[in-house]
């Protein structure tokens, strides 16, 4: 039996071994074929992002399916393993497993895995708002079973926040000056999120400064006297709220990227400021700005040598604090001129220098920095997207839909994004819907550039495709902060409506141009603005704008080189051929006279613009590389002066091709205002051989305005233009005005200041008169280009010559006017300037009133503003202001044309009311006092049009040309209300007399003298003239029509820190509490012990542990204080802010019932009892007072044996030891320091009698009262001792002095306190 059993056992073991071996072999084969966990390592280098932004650190992996029996969810762990300085660190951030994410306490609220809930294989970490300390090396580790994969992602946070103080004084910058100071420091004004991020990294500065949202704030990490702000003793960013832009403060700036190197120059002999500039120039550099030095310090520069900077300040960067290098903390030190830390050193003083050398000086169009006028206006990612090694994909289901309203920025602040064309990017954006979502790294921004369809396509009626393009140019360095797309911002790829010919698709091909006929379609850049703010969510596709960046020249046919060309701002090719369409979102209006849809429909409408001319261009285009300073951004910063489309003198040949299109523009940003975008139908009619493009309006009796976007905060700059518009926006080198057209076919010779003649043209083919645009002044930034372009074919003066007028014609006609609501018709003005016939004609030119060859001139303009304030617009010389008469509207109705016998200027508005088309309004130069605050919210769009009847132009009644765009000018609401006549006064000063030979017409304004000539304002007031009226701006302390009233300066409580204001003649005086000084009690001269908080001259400390009232008072006395007393509502609020529990105070009536006293012996000056308190409820047992927390700290009397928290109070100024008194000593232990209001008592030594008061008190100024006590011996004892002495020595002193003599010569004892008379009051 034993043998069969052994055999059976052996067979069983063999089968088991074979089974195990088979299983092991199968597992080995599976492992060899594929792994279950694989991480996709990007290896794209360092991730860079700016301070206070969001960034995503990529971590992607793939998982192979496992047998159900062995399924195990992967475990994800993010860890920071190295700091920015390279020190090793092991700081856990979060762990995630099976859709459960646990975040470390120090990272809560700042990190998340946004894609993990939907896709477990995407562990991309979203981090932000970023701090400077977030820079370092991060590790993503994925573990499943025994498999372990990890990837390292370096993060670099760029940008630094710094405080800037004017050279004049502390708090010397208005909001506009603060923005300019930051700009000159190679920075922008910091946003609140920047300052908050800097504070969270330890930034502490007790100087209030402007921020981009017009608030004033400062960061405090350690509370100290004078720096409490609105947060009492708590750390945080203090805020003064939104302030008047004219108030004076310092500023906090944000410098984002260095873009070069800062190096120290320390020659053997130190340099003056001029010498430092020269020394830097000799080394191919320039003096570094303040922002550049801070960025260099942020990147590691450490130099303990003060050096000159570009703004005339002297500073030096310290990384490692050391002796004689400016303090214990790292930072950029500043050398001030005065002891109060103000003023820059004299330029003649000698220091070293810090120079800056740019890496690529030709690349000046990188990040766009726009100043903020309300909330943050910082432009992010103004350059193209960075190079990516992985092809990102956009999944179709993840495209944002129009009903998506979830905020995409966690900070809650508005943050416009500007997308522009990337210059020279060989990357192909090829969507593959099946791949994982990788489009969010390194950026989710879509870089769009639309190319218009050709005219042939449009003529054939086929749908032309618009596609995304990238224009090549010089290689640009990789810039920082290009990973904003990881925040989840996606931009919709909207399919066009049926019948529209627009669309977008990704492409890597550069823009092409049709060459054989020299036709070139200019590449366009799409500017997409995303506004995300509190209370309002904006879709990123709601504001799509087109602008011509590089117009081409030539005629149709063929292919051309893909090399881009760019024209200078004052030069536009005379022959523009092409047809482009681009979608613009419009708000559809009802067509009926009173119909109003309940819900406006949004639809896509194309913009069209075609301009063609048979003749080729008489000049040469030049590539971008020849003009590195040309702006490359496809974003208009507000309405600009428009330039003429032809560079050569006007030709009289009339070859007319009509082109239709729409062009819209928006005013510059304005705080506390809303901006609407409107589209204005515009057609361009080029005339002449050279193809002069003349802006016209379609033939119809009214103007049609369509609202093209949602109401947006006015600080966002937007501009929309037809893609082939021959009126591109330019810089201020060109000033364009409108003058009446002339009916003559020959040019009118005009002689300007320089004496050169210019041609003014109107063709005889146009029986309808209109407006002409004139170039008042053309500055020549590229003279060499002009010489090329003009050549011998120019029959008259070149374009760059001063005084040359180039006049394209504007055919003024209107489309039907349709209003959207019913309401009364409002006439804006009754008293107007009547345009009467006149034989004189000419064109108004700044500084010139010489007109030659007068011709019959006609004028019939209409200027309309699409806003509730309806106003005619005029153009002034740079530096002047435009006055706008305001008109309140009560509603709107469909206005019908009213035939008039003569043509008049019309103002119309659609925001609430409509005005009859033919209402007179004056044109002229208004009188606006300099320095008057303006409201820039007026003037959102303008249309120029005219009716059929014409009258001769009268230059006496129209002194200024009308323009379609205004730049660097301000609009001001002069007056106006419903039913109140608005005034628009025309003032002619001595420098601008009435035009010779032109009599004043009926209805024109008379010339008035200056009412401020004798300055009627008293006490230093400033006189502001407004026609015949004037107003006085009074200095502080005065009021009245002529500043004749001396008001109380103390009404505004100018004294700080509880100081008492005393009004005096022409000023005031502040009486400061102890430990404060200065003219406004703003200087803190004494502090508090550690753990104590100062308020109005006293130190307070809250103790949360509970004690009975007596024990609490005893503990406060042990700390040289008492239970707190309360003497004002401000002090009560301060004490009540400490805790949220009932708290003991020092008030009690333990000695005499109902006679409440403070334990520090101060008077009862303030009471804050609960209703029906004190009530002594326990019949004599309620002798102590408590602050009741749930009733705003009101008082109640309770028994003294309750155990409650308490607040101790003591003075900041302490008295030294009490003065010594002869024959007396102190009662109790003698201490080195005594609190304010402390009292001590003297007692006379044994055998001496006390006279006068025995106590003295420590005064609030730190000095003791003068002791009054006198200790003397009793007179009886003195007589007995004298008699005994006389009897004993009678025989020895026969010649003793008499009693009277002895008393006369007796020496009185000198008391100690008389020696220190100066120390007491």
Swiss-Prot record:
Give the Polar residues compositional bias ranges: 363-373, 906-922
Single GO molecular function: carbohydrate binding
Stretches with biased composition (Basic and acidic residues): 1309-1321
Report the domain of life of the source organism. Answer: Eukaryota
In this chain, the stretch annotated as Disordered covers: 362-414, 455-479, 493-518, 531-579, 683-729, 745-766, 876-956, 1275-1321
Signal peptide range in chain numbering: 1-22
Which cysteine-cysteine pairs are annotated as disulfide bonds in the entry?
59-140, 182-253, 206-227, 280-355, 304-325, 1012-1023, 1017-1032, 1034-1043, 1050-1061, 1055-1070, 1072-1081, 1088-1099, 1116-1208, 1184-1200, 1215-1258, 1244-1271
On modification after translation, the UniProt record reads: O-glycosylated; contains chondroitin sulfate.
Glycosylated position list:
122, 340, 381, 411, 1026, 1223
Q: What are the Link domain coordinates in residue numbering?
A: 160-255, 259-357
Which part of the chain is the Ig-like V-type domain?
A: 38-153
Q: In the UniProt record, does the keyword Disulfide bond occur?
A: yes
The answer to whether UniProt assigns keyword Repeat to this entry is yes
Residues covered by the EGF-like domain: 1008-1044, 1046-1082
Q: Where is the composition biased (Low complexity)?
A: 935-948
GO cellular component terms listed in the entry, alphabetical order:
extracellular space; perineuronal net; synapse
Q: Which UniProt keywords apply?
A: Calcium, Cell adhesion, Disulfide bond, EGF-like domain, Glycoprotein, Hyaluronic acid, Immunoglobulin domain, Lectin, Proteoglycan, Repeat, Secreted, Signal, Sushi
Show the InterPro entries listed in the entry: C-type_lectin-like, C-type_lectin-like/link_sf, C-type_lectin_CS, CTDL_fold, EGF-like_Ca-bd_dom, EGF-like_dom, EGF-type_Asp/Asn_hydroxyl_site, EGF_Ca-bd_CS
- Which subcellular locations apply to this protein? Secreted
Domain Sushi residues, every copy: 1213-1273
Q: What broad class describes the main subcellular location of this protein?
A: secreted
What GO terms describe the biological role, i.e. biological process, of this protein?
A: cell adhesion; central nervous system development; skeletal system development
- Indicate the family of this protein: Belongs to the aggrecan/versican proteoglycan family.
Its biological purpose is as follows:
May modulate neuronal adhesion and neurite growth during development by binding to neural cell adhesion molecules (NG-CAM and N-CAM). Chondroitin sulfate proteoglycan; binds to hyaluronic acid.
Write down what this protein is called: Neurocan core protein
Q: Which organism is it from?
A: Pan troglodytes (Chimpanzee)
């Amino acid at each position: 039996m034993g043998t069969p059993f052994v055999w059976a056992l052996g067979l069983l073991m063999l089968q088991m071994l074979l089974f195990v071996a088979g299983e092991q072999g199968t597992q080995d084969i599976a492992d060899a074929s594929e792994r279950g966990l694989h991480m996709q390592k990007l290896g794209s280098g360092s991730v860079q992002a700016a301070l206070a932004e969001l960034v995503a650190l990529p971590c992607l992996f793939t998982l192979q399916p496992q047998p159900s029996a062995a399924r195990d969810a992967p475990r994800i762990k993010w860890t920071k393993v190295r700091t920015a300085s390279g020190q090793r660190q092991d700081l856990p951030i979060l762990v995630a497993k099976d859709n459960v994410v646990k975040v470390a306490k120090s990272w809560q609220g700042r990190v998340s895995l946004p894609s993990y809930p939907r896709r477990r294989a995407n562990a991309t970490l979203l981090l932000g708002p970023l701090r400077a300390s977030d820079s370092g090396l991060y590790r993503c580790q994925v573990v499943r079973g025994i498999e372990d994969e990890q990837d390292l992602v370096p993060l670099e946070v760029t940008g630094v926040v710094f405080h800037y103080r004017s050279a004049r004084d502390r708090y010397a910058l208005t909001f506009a000056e603060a923005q300019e100071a930051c700009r000159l420091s190679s920075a922008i004004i910091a946003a609140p999120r920047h300052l908050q991020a800097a504070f969270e990294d330890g930034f502490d500065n007790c100087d209030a400064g402007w921020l981009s949202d017009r608030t004033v704030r400062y960061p405090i990490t350690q509370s100290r006297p004078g720096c409490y702000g609105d947060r009492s003793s708590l750390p945080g960013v203090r805020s003064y709220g939104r302030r008047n832009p004219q108030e004076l403060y310092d500023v906090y700036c944000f410098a984002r990227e260095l873009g070069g190197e800062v190096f120290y120059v320390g020659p053997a002999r130190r340099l003056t400021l001029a010498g430092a500039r020269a020394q830097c120039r000799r080394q191919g550099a320039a003096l570094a700005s303040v922002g550049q030095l801070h960025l260099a310090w942020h990147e590691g520069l450490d130099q303990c040598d003060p050096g000159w900077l570009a703004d005339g300040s002297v500073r030096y960067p310290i990384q490692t604090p050391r002796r004689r290098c400016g303090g214990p903390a790292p930072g950029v030190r500043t050398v001030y001129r005065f002891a109060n830390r103000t003023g820059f050193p004299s330029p003649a003083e000698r220091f070293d220098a810090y120079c800056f050398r740019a890496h690529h000086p030709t690349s000046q169009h990188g990040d766009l920095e726009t100043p903020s006028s309300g909330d943050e206006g910082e432009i992010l990612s103004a350059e193209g997207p960075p190079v990516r090694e992985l092809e990102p994909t956009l999944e179709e289901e993840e495209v944002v839909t129009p009903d998506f309203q979830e905020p995409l920025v966690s900070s809650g602040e508005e943050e416009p994004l500007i997308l522009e064309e990337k210059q020279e990017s060989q990357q192909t954006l090829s969507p593959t819907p099946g791949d994982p979502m990788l489009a969010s790294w390194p950026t989710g921004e879509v870089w769009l550039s639309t190319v218009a369809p050709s005219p042939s396509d449009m003529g054939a009626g086929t749908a032309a495709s618009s596609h995304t393009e990238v224009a090549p140019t010089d290689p640009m360095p990789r810039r920082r902060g290009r990973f904003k797309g990881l925040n989840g911002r996606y931009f919709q790829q909207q399919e066009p409506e049926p019948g529209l010919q627009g669309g977008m698709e990704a492409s890597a091909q550069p823009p092409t141009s049709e060459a054989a006929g020299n036709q070139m379609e200019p590449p366009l850049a799409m500017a997409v603005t995303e506004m995300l703010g509190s209370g309002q969510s904006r879709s990123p596709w709601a504001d799509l704008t087109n602008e011509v960046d590089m117009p081409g020249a030539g005629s149709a046919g063929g292919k051309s080189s893909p090399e881009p060309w760019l024209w200078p701002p004052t030069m536009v090719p005379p022959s523009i051929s092409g047809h482009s369409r681009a979608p613009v979102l419009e708000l559809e209006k009802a067509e009926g006279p009173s119909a109003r849809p309940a819900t406006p429909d949004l639809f896509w409408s194309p913009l069209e613009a075609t301009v063609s001319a048979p003749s080729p261009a008489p000049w040469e285009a030049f590539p971008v590389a020849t003009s590195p300073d040309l702006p490359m951004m496809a974003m208009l910063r507000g309405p600009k002066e428009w330039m003429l489309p032809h560079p050569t003198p006007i030709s009289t040949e009339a070859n007319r091709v009509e082109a239709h299109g729409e062009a819209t523009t928006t005013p510059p940003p304005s705080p506390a205002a809303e901006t609407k975008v409107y589209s204005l139908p515009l057609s361009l009619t080029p005339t002449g051989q050279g193809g002069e493009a003349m802006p016209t309006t379609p033939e119809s009796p009214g103007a049609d305005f369509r609202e093209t976007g949602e109401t947006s905060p006015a600080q966002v700059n937007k501009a929309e233009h037809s893609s082939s518009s021959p009126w591109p926006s330019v810089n201020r080198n060109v000033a364009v005005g409108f003058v009446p057209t002339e009916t003559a076919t020959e040019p009118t010779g005009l002689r300007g200041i320089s004496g050169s003649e210019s041609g003014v043209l109107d063709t005889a083919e146009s029986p309808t008169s209109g407006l002409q645009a004139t170039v008042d002044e053309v500055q020549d930034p590229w003279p060499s280009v002009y010489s090329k372009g003009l050549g011998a074919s120019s029959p008259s003066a070149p374009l760059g010559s001063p005084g040359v007028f180039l006049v394209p014609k504007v055919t003024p006609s209107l489309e039907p006017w349709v209003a959207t609501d019913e309401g009364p018709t409002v006439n804006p003005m009754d008293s107007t300037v009547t345009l009467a016939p006149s034989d004189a004609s000419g064109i108004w030119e700044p500084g010139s009133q010489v007109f030659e060859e007068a011709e019959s001139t006609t004028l019939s303009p209409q200027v309309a503003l699409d806003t509730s304030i309806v106003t005619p617009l005029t153009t002034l010389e740079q530096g002047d202001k435009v006055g706008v008469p305001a008109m309140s509207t009560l509603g709107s109705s469909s206005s019908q044309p009213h035939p008039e016998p003569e043509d008049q200027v019309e103002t119309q508005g659609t925001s609430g009311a409509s005005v009859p088309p033919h209402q007179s309004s004056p044109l002229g130069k208004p009188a606006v006092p300099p320095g008057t605050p303006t409201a820039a919210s007026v003037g959102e769009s303008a249309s120029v049009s005219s009716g059929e009847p014409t009258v001769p132009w009268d230059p006496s009644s129209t002194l200024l040309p009308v323009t379609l765009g205004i730049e660097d000018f301000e609009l001001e609401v002069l007056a106006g209300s419903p039913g109140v006549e608005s005034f628009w006064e025309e003032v002619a000063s001595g420098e601008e007399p009435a035009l010779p030979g032109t009599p004043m017409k009926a209805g024109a304004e008379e010339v008035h003298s200056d009412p401020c000539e004798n300055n009627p304002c008293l006490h230093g007031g400033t006189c502001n003239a407004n026609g015949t009226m004037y107003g006085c701006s009074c200095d502080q302390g005065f009021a009245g029509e002529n500043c004749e009233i001396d008001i109380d300066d103390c009404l505004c409580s100018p004294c700080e820190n509880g100081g008492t204001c005393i009004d005096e003649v022409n000023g005031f005086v502040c009486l400061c509490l102890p430990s404060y000084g200065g003219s406004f009690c703003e200087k803190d001269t004494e502090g508090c012990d550690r753990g104590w908080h100062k308020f109005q001259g006293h130190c307070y400390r809250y103790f949360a542990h509970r004690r009975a009232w007596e024990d609490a008072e005893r503990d406060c006395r042990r700390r040289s204080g008492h239970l707190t007393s309360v003497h004002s509502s401000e002090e009560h609020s301060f004490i009540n802010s400490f805790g949220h529990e009932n708290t003991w105070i020092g008030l009690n009536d333990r000695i005499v019932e109902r006679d409440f006293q403070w334990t520090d012996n101060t008077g009862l000056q303030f009471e804050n009892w609960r209703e029906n308190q004190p009530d002594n409820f326990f019949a004599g047992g309620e002798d102590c007072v408590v602050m009741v927390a749930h009733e705003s700290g009101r008082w109640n009397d309770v028994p003294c044996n309750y155990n409650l928290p308490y607040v101790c109070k003591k003075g900041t100024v302490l008295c030294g030891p009490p003065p010594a008194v002869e024959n007396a000593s102190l009662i109790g232990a003698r201490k080195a320091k005594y609190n304010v209001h402390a009292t001590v008592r003297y007692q006379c030594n044994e055998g001496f009698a006390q006279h006068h008061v025995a106590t003295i008190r420590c005064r609030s100024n730190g000095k003791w009262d003068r002791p009054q006590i006198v200790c003397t011996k009793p007179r009886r004892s003195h007589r007995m001792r004298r008699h005994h002495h006389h009897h004993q020595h009678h025989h020895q002193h026969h010649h003793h002095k008499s009693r009277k003599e002895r008393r006369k010569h007796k020496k009185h004892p000198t008391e100690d306190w008389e020696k220190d008379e100066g120390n007491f009051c």
